[in-house]
Amino acid sequence: MAQSDITIDALDKVGRQDAEYLVSLVRSIPGFPKEGIIFRDFIPVFADPKGLRILLEALEAALPVPASEFDSIAGLESRGFLFGPALAARMGKGFIAVRKAGKLPPETIGESYDLEYGSARVEIETDAVQAGERVLIVDDLIATGGTAKAATDLIDKVGGTVAGYGFVMRLEGLDGIDKLGGKPVSSLMAMPA
């Protein structure tokens, strides 16, 4: 599928030329991880210093809530790990790792969820979030909303509060944002599912 199927949402906050440059780095891979899925790969952004700079600037410019309204950033494995810590460092915030099951040392708490192509489970360490801590959840993609909803449930279980969500990409037509309880959401670009 051509890159022309990607529309720019909040990327215009960094300028049209930079936004188009960033979109040009996103690869569309049909049939991965299974037939009928078009995988949107933005890993090439991280190999490109200009692309990475634009990505971080755009994410910060498009925050769904002011930085004063959250204390830390939770990144969802795996691509949320690639930009979440850099964004947190830019903003003077801590970073929380939301990992796939079995990847963290005990004690952990987990939540199962459905993906657009299967099911999975995520975990956090039970002391990763302090009572009353306000958390911004970030990830590369919102599709069905299952991963972000599971992360929300985990943060709630350990006494934190989700302030909002920031995504690089949003798949249209899958209604994932509807699962996020009406909390503020931003995405940089959108594309058909």
UniProtKB/Swiss-Prot annotation:
<comment type="function">
    <text>Catalyzes a salvage reaction resulting in the formation of AMP, that is energically less costly than de novo synthesis.</text>
</comment>
<comment type="pathway">
    <text>Purine metabolism; AMP biosynthesis via salvage pathway; AMP from adenine: step 1/1.</text>
</comment>
<dbReference type="GO" id="GO:0005737">
    <property type="term" value="C:cytoplasm"/>
</dbReference>
<dbReference type="InterPro" id="IPR000836">
    <property type="entry name" value="PRibTrfase_dom"/>
</dbReference>
<comment type="similarity">
    <text>Belongs to the purine/pyrimidine phosphoribosyltransferase family.</text>
</comment>
<dbReference type="GO" id="GO:0002055">
    <property type="term" value="F:adenine binding"/>
</dbReference>
<dbReference type="GO" id="GO:0016208">
    <property type="term" value="F:AMP binding"/>
</dbReference>
<dbReference type="InterPro" id="IPR029057">
    <property type="entry name" value="PRTase-like"/>
</dbReference>
<protein>
    <recommendedName>
        <fullName>Adenine phosphoribosyltransferase</fullName>
        <ecNumber>2.4.2.7</ecNumber>
    </recommendedName>
</protein>
<keyword id="KW-0328">Glycosyltransferase</keyword>
<keyword id="KW-0963">Cytoplasm</keyword>
<keyword id="KW-0660">Purine salvage</keyword>
<dbReference type="GO" id="GO:0006166">
    <property type="term" value="P:purine ribonucleoside salvage"/>
</dbReference>
<dbReference type="InterPro" id="IPR050054">
    <property type="entry name" value="UPRTase/APRTase"/>
</dbReference>
<dbReference type="GO" id="GO:0006168">
    <property type="term" value="P:adenine salvage"/>
</dbReference>
<dbReference type="GO" id="GO:0003999">
    <property type="term" value="F:adenine phosphoribosyltransferase activity"/>
</dbReference>
<dbReference type="GO" id="GO:0044209">
    <property type="term" value="P:AMP salvage"/>
</dbReference>
<keyword id="KW-0808">Transferase</keyword>
<comment type="subunit">
    <text>Homodimer.</text>
</comment>
<dbReference type="Pfam" id="PF00156">
    <property type="entry name" value="Pribosyltran"/>
</dbReference>
<dbReference type="InterPro" id="IPR005764">
    <property type="entry name" value="Ade_phspho_trans"/>
</dbReference>
